[in-house]
Amino acid sequence: MMEHAEHSPAAIREKAAGAVNCQSVTLPSGLTVLCRTMPGYSSVHAMYATNFGSVVREFTLNGKRIQLPAGTAHFLEHKMFESEQGDAFDLYAKTGAAANAFTSYDRTCYIFTATGMTDENLDILLNMVGHPWFTKETIAKEQGIIGQEIKMYDDSPDWRLLTALFRCLYKSHPIRDDIAGTTQSIAELTPELLYACTDAFYRPGNMVLSVAGNITLDQAVEACRRNGVYDAVEPPQVETIFPQEADTVQHKAVSYTHL
């Protein structure tokens, strides 16, 4: 079937951007910056996202093959808030911003909402994600925290049923595994593995900074310039690897009893 130009993905994105008056620019570093300035609004919403989620379990980085345990992307999301200087949540508390993050199957996103100190909050966000810091000690501490989160989701019938459904549909694809992994899988993580992930996927060309509210595109771009993600850099050679999936479902039925 031929694809009409007005129905192409690029045309649809352009139409959607025009409908919400969204500006966009790709920086020399490869980072995409999206901005929707909203006159009359007091707050600013920002999201810094990478194309790296739970289904990425194997990749090559500059020719070296790397395998990840289940839950790596989610674990990394937690660790990005911590640096040698302290916890990013403490910095956000001083500016009055509300911050959070989430991991999906194919994305990891870091967000904040604030009504003031926009430049300072953007600096916290970009610096936090741009300067990862991992040690064996901090990883061990986080393993205990995330282990409790995993147990919490184990008590959710909806989440367990969704996971069971994916295990029915897929034989090998990593979507079969819980986004957070298991207590056993995250115990395999090391600083070297996490740094390999940030080198491969937390690079400007694989990320998007999206802002909206009482902010301009120039402000967002200037924040990128201040925090070292504006200028062109030589990207690493990265190839994501997925297992060959069967044409038939793994199982035809699933049942789950929650007591």
What is each stretch, according to the model?
Residues 2-4, 84-197, 218, 243-244:
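Acidic/histidine-enriched segments that form metal/cofactor-coordinating
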